[in-house]
Regions:
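Weak global preference for isoleucine
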Residues: 4, 9, 23, 56, ...
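N-terminal regions immediately upstream of nucleotidyltransferase
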Residues: 1-76, 87-97, 123-126
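Long, well-ordered hydrophobic secondary-structure segments characteristic of membrane-embedded
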Residues: 82-86
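Alpha-helical structural motif
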Residues: 34, 98, 213-217
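Conserved catalytic core of two-metal-ion nucleotidyltransferases
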Residues: 42-46, 64, 96-183, 189-191
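Nucleotidyltransferase catalytic cores
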Residues: 1-18, 50, 162-217
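A structural signal for short, well-ordered beta-strand segments
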Residues: 79-81, 136
Length: 217
């Protein structure tokens, strides 16, 4: 019984610690609203990008639900985003052209123009003072990898400012959605293992351990 109580106290302490580190729901929703607004601007009917049906979606910690609070008040939340343009092919466009297309559309909005940082190596960055900054990564489909199916069906080709402006057949690759799916599948097995370990530590059956008490890394 004493062992279970100690485990319970430790679990509550860890839960509180994780909650203190986590991004507040209000901030999360605010960031989501802002990047959805960016996506709406990129895809407006009058936008030159509208024919490519721009899609903005999060990648990295924001897509995995692992965003943590900035260390100090001077730091900001980092929101990594993909700007996917459908229909564009590496055979008919260059990385420089893709990067410029997205950047020009952002600059056409007076608000975003003021928020834009200097062009990054792979991203366009919008700086929301004392809140967060959004790194927007232009991307197109990686047809060769997607043809292999599975997690690779989400593969992307991305831009790199260090690449030449010509239609280089070798593009940097990325697969944020595939990674999220892989991560979640791995978490399922980790969850089951942690639940079993917790049950063993308190000499209880697995079914006696509530799911909410199991915190995956």
């Amino acid at each position: 019984m004493e062992t279970f109580e100690k485990a319970s106290i430790l679990s509550r302490s860890l839960d509180q610690f994780a909650e203190d580190l986590d991004i507040p729901e209000g901030k999360f929703l605010e960031a989501k609203k802002r990047y959805e607004s960016v996506g709406a601007w990129l895809g407006k009917d009058e936008s030159p990008l509208s024919v490519y049906t721009p899609e903005i979606y999060p990648q990295g910690s924001f897509s995995l639900g692992t965003v943590i609070k900035p260390i100090t008040n001077k730091d900001e939340y980092d929101v990594d985003l993909v700007c996917f343009l459908a229909g564009l092919k590496k055979e008919t466009t260059s990385q420089a052209e893709l990067k410029t297309m997205v950047g020009d559309r952002l600059k056409a909005n007076e608000t975003y123009k003021k928020l834009l940082d200097q062009e990054g190596r792979r991203c366009w960055t919008l700086n929301y003072a004392n809140e967060f900054h959004m790194d927007i990564l232009p991307a197109i489909t990686d047809d060769a990898l997607r043809a292999q199916g599975g997690l690779l069906s989400h593969a992307l080709l991305i831009t790199d400012i260090q690449k030449i402006a010509d239609k280089d057949p070798e593009w940097p690759k990325s697969n944020p959605r595939g990674y999220v799916l892989w991560f979640k599948s791995r978490q399922e097995s980790v969850f089951l293992a942690l639940r079993k370990r917790l049950a063993e530590s308190v000499k209880a059956s697995v079914d006696e351990i509530p799911e909410y008490r199991v915190k995956t890394p």
